[in-house]
UniProtKB/Swiss-Prot annotation:
Nucleotide-binding found in the keyword field: no
Location of the protein in the cell: Cytoplasm
Described purpose of this protein according to its UniProt entry: Together with the chaperonin GroEL, plays an essential role in assisting protein folding. The GroEL-GroES system forms a nano-cage that allows encapsulation of the non-native substrate proteins and provides a physical environment optimized to promote and accelerate protein folding. GroES binds to the apical surface of the GroEL ring, thereby capping the opening of the GroEL channel.
Species in which this protein is naturally found: Chlorobium phaeobacteroides (strain DSM 266 / SMG 266 / 2430)
Major location (coarse): cytoplasm
UniProt family annotation: Belongs to the GroES chaperonin family.
HAMAP family (alphabetical): CH10 (MF_00580)
Protein name: Co-chaperonin GroES
Assembly and interaction partners: Heptamer of 7 subunits arranged in a ring. Interacts with the chaperonin GroEL.
One term of GO molecular function: protein folding chaperone
Entry keyword Chaperone: yes
InterPro entries: Chaperonin_GroES, Chaperonin_GroES_sf, Chaprnonin_Cpn10_CS, GroES-like_sf
Alphabetical UniProt keywords: Chaperone, Cytoplasm
GO-annotated biological processes: chaperone cofactor-dependent protein refolding
Length: 95
């Protein structure tokens, strides 16, 4: 099944959570923080401005992005976890 976002929405595959601390201690599942970055796997067609003009997406598939802690909606498709969020929820592109 393929996910195809609509309008100005983006589908992000979150990076895996850290398993160990820098000192080598294993972090239990309850202590893991959700990562705030991931890779874009799909983008919508863009946002329609008030004038009716279609504004292209600045985010492209394959880019690594930084987003807010509470951004997006979590979905699971065929055992894989994704976030669906608006392009405006993305803070930066990571190089």
């Amino acid at each position: 099944m393929n996910l195809k976002p609509l309008a100005d929405r983006v589908i992000v595959k979150p990076a895996p959570a850290e398993e160990k601390t820098k000192g080598g201690l294993i972090i239990p599942d309850t202590g893991k923080e959700k990562p705030q970055y991931g890779e874009v796997v799909a983008v919508g067609t863009g946002k329609v401005a008030d004038s009716g003009q279609l504004l292209e997406m600045q985010i492209k598939v394959g880019q690594k992005v930084l987003y807010g802690k509470y951004s997006g909606t979590e979905v699971s498709v065929e055992g894989e976890d994704y976030l669906i969020m608006r392009e405006s929820d993305i803070f930066a592109i990571l190089d």
